[in-house]
């Protein structure tokens, strides 16, 4: 497990405006919790706590 930005299949983050949607997205994917990271490296994006290793995360490189 790891703490990371959860990613869409094309290596794009899930942008957010609040914590509720991110917490649901993260927990639905097996994480302990999640929140909206404001003004982070990828803008306002969902950050998951203890996300399972089989769920894609944002990695260096382009979002396409």
UniProtKB/Swiss-Prot annotation:
InterPro entries: LCN-type_CS_alpha_beta_dom, Scorpion_toxin-like, Scorpion_toxin-like_sf, Scorpion_toxinL, Scorpion_toxinL/defensin. One of its GO terms (molecular function) is toxin activity. PROSITE patterns: LCN_CSAB. It comes from the Eukaryota. Keywords: Disulfide bond, Ion channel impairing toxin, Neurotoxin, Secreted, Toxin, Voltage-gated sodium channel impairing toxin. Disulfide bonds join 12-63, 16-36, 22-46, 26-48. One of its GO terms (cellular component) is extracellular region. Pfam families: Toxin_3. Residues 2-64 form the LCN-type CS-alpha/beta domain. The keyword Zinc-finger does not apply. It is found in: Secreted. Expressed by the venom gland. GO terms for biological process: defense response. Signal peptide: none annotated. Belongs to the long (4 C-C) scorpion toxin superfamily. Sodium channel inhibitor family. Alpha subfamily. Has the structural arrangement of an alpha-helix connected to antiparallel beta-sheets by disulfide bonds (CS-alpha/beta). Alpha toxins bind voltage-independently at site-3 of sodium channels (Nav) and inhibit the inactivation of the activated channels, thereby blocking neuronal transmission. This toxin is active against mammals. This is Alpha-like toxin BmK-M4. It comes from Olivierus martensii.
């Amino acid at each position: 497990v790891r703490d990371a930005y959860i990613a869409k299949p094309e290596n794009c983050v899930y942008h957010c405006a609040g914590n509720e949607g991110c917490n649901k997205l993260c927990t639905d994917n097996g994480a302990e919790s999640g929140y909206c990271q404001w003004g982070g490296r990828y803008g306002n994006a969902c950050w998951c706590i203890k996300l399972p290793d089989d769920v894609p995360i944002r990695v260096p490189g382009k979002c396409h």
